Regions:
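C-terminal accessory region of radical SAM enzymes
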Residues: 224-259, 282-335
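N-terminal pre-core extensions flanking Radical SAM catalytic domains
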Residues: 1-73, 87-90, 262, 272, ...
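Short cysteine clusters
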Residues: 59, 63-66, 268, 286, ...
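Radical SAM/AdoMet-radical enzyme domain recognition
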Residues: 79-101, 106-213
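Short, acidic, Ser/Thr-enriched surface-loop or helix-capping motifs
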Residues: 25, 277-280
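Short, basic/aromatic recognition patches
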Residues: 257-268
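Residue-level recognition of short loop/turn positions
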Residues: 62, 101, 279-280
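Iron-sulfur (Fe-S) cluster-binding segments and ferredoxin-like electron-carrier domains
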Residues: 68-77, 290-295, 331-348
Length: 348
């Protein structure tokens, strides 16, 4: 792996795999380019490009749909362990760390964590429930983070969100809104995409996350294909705000969004380009695997060793590579959708 910086542009060259990565550390623009005549890389053999890191499982909202079942008794990841993770992440060539939880900004050493990540040459971001955003934290966010996201909680309180978003963006922070696509949000979001609320004026993008029935109830799953179709078609036509999806939504995107160029589509990146580290130092291909045997233990192995040699990661890569939908016209892009929770796939 070879690294070069041109201003805010980080260029990472993977010679053995015949591709390079262009990552703008200021804007977040990310491009993976294979060499002429070579296929797209299936995974990064050096280490994950992105790590989702849970630095706490503390959260006072205690939502019934929370897949981490975070609560007010949730534990914080010790700072000394975070330091060790960051050293190993830097050695593995990690480009971005997305902090989560729980509510990450309520970790008592959150500002110091942001500073340390950025000083390690890695770009931090985080998702918050909106609580505990002090001026000190927002100032640090504007200095160190590429972006931050606020999670959306129905019912929609316009006054609350407008006040919160005005405060955040007054610091010059690039702000995203994360919305879980589920039974009590899909119709509202379809309306928003057709008739933009004032909220959109403050957003860099709105990111939709497919609901996963982990730790919650399956009643939140949207299984009505007509509702899904109408929503994705509205997203396809929307020009009022930038729109993103998690890769768990791929089966819906390829079916109902016709204006998305294939080079902007990325199927499940778990164990291929990203990994999740829990606050108890277990490293999983995906955060939704917590509580399963699909992990490596950072108490006994290094981050890079787990990435390269762990059976959990090797087996999941193989599952993505081989468990495709034979005869499906979208197979080359979708790669079988979610290989861990088949029930979240939106195939008709």
């Amino acid at each position: 792996m070879q690294l070069m910086m041109l201003g805010d542009l980080k260029i990472v060259r993977h010679n053995s795999q015949h591709y390079r990565v262009l990552f703008n550390t200021k804007t977040g623009t990310f491009i993976r380019m294979e060499d002429k005549g070579f296929p797209e890389p299936f995974w990064c053999e050096n280490g994950p490009e992105l790590i989702d890191l849970s630095i706490t499982n503390y959260c006072t909202r205690e939502c019934e749909f929370c897949y981490r079942q975070s609560n007010h008794q949730g534990k914080h990841l010790p700072f000394i362990d975070i330091q060790r993770i960051l050293k190993q992440a830097k050695d593995a060539g990690v480009l971005q760390i997305a902090l989560g939880g729980g509510n990450p900004n309520q970790h008592p050493q959150f500002v110091e964590i942001l500073r340390l990540i950025r000083e390690s040459g890695i770009v931090p971001s985080y998702t918050t429930n909106g609580l505990g955003l002090t001026d000190k934290i927002l100032q640090a966010t504007s200095i160190y983070c590429g972006a931050m996201a606020v999670s959306f909680y129905p019912p929609y309180d316009q006054e609350y969100y407008l006040k919160l978003f005005k405060k955040i963006t007054s610091y010059g922070i690039r702000l995203n809104l994360h919305v879980i696509l589920k039974q009590d949000t899909i119709e509202m979001m379809t309306e928003w995409l057709s008739e933009a609320p004032k909220l959109f004026d403050y957003l860099n993008a709105i990111i939709f996350l497919n609901y996963k029935p982990i730790g919650g109830t399956k009643n939140f799953l949207v299984k009505d294909s007509n509702k899904l179709k109408v929503f994705f078609e509205a997203a396809d036509k929307c020009k009022k705000v930038k729109i993103g999806f998690d890769s768990c939504s791929m089966s819906g995107i390829v079916q109902w969004m016709k204006n998305v160029r294939p080079e902007f589509l990325e199927p499940c990146e778990a164990a291929r380009f990203s990994a999740f580290i829990s606050e108890d130092l277990k490293m999983y291909p995906c955060s939704f695997m917590v509580g399963t045997d699909f992990y490596g233990d950072l108490h006994t192995q290094s981050l890079k060793d787990i990435w390269l040699t762990s059976k959990a990661f090797q087996n999941f890569r193989n599952r993505i590579k081989t468990n495709h939908c034979e005869g499906c016209q979208f197979d080359a892009v979708c790669k079988g959708g979610c290989q861990f929770l088949n029930e979240i796939n939106m195939c008709e």
